[in-house]
Amino acid sequence: ASAKYSAVVGGGKNTASGLSAFVGAGCGNTASGNNAAVVVGGMSNTASGLSAFVGGGCGNTAAGKGSVVVGGSNNITCGGHSTVGGGACNTAQTEDSVVAGGRCNITCGDHSTVGGGLNNTAADSGCWATVAGGCGNTASTSGFVGGGMANCAKATNCWATVPGGCGNCACGGGSTVGGGKANCSLATVATVAGGCRNDASTDFSFVGGGCCNRILTCGDTIAGGKENRSAGGCAFIGGGLTLSANNVFDIIGGGCGNRTCSDTTYGGYSFIGGGKDNVTVCGA
């Protein structure tokens, strides 16, 4: 203990070099912060930030002002008042950010949180992002990813949500992908509830499930099915295969290969209940 009011209680090769610094025990620990840095124990831990704290573990560093590493190994807190609870190789880079545990997780935006898992990133841009767990997930400004694998909630104007699944992406403001695989909601308040390779690319659009369904105009709905396409505006497809709703307020309940007229002058408000290869005639 080399600084005023500093103390090393026990252990070996410990150093308390900051004003009012404290090392409780362990081996090779250093408390060097400007004021009141603390290392309770463990091995090769460093508290270098003002009033920084390391509880234990191995190779942990609390470098931010008032930052905390509770335990684990090779964890780092760089942001002021940031926290890493445990795990390994986690980094809380920014102000008031938290990594609770897991491995190789990182918070890049202020007030962001990673609960656990592996290789997750909260707020690669912006702040207030949350990744609860999973693997390889990313959340940006005010975005939320619950879990799963390789999901992203990356809206530039906030509030994108992906609770789970694999390879899903919510990129529009207030957009949601509930789960499934390789689904995308790309516009404001667009939603894909589940399924596989579905695309809600316009504002206020909705895909319930199924596979390879695509919405191209605002306010459209595809409840399910496969390879259906809605491009009408407030149009609806219930389910089925290779259905196409092409004009405003068109409805196709189901079936296979059914399509409505695409003429914007004479089409619209068409209805096909089901069947196969049915077509509504424009102006009829």
Where are these regions (language model features)?
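Periodic small-residue-enriched repeat registers in elongated scaffold domains
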Residues: 1-284
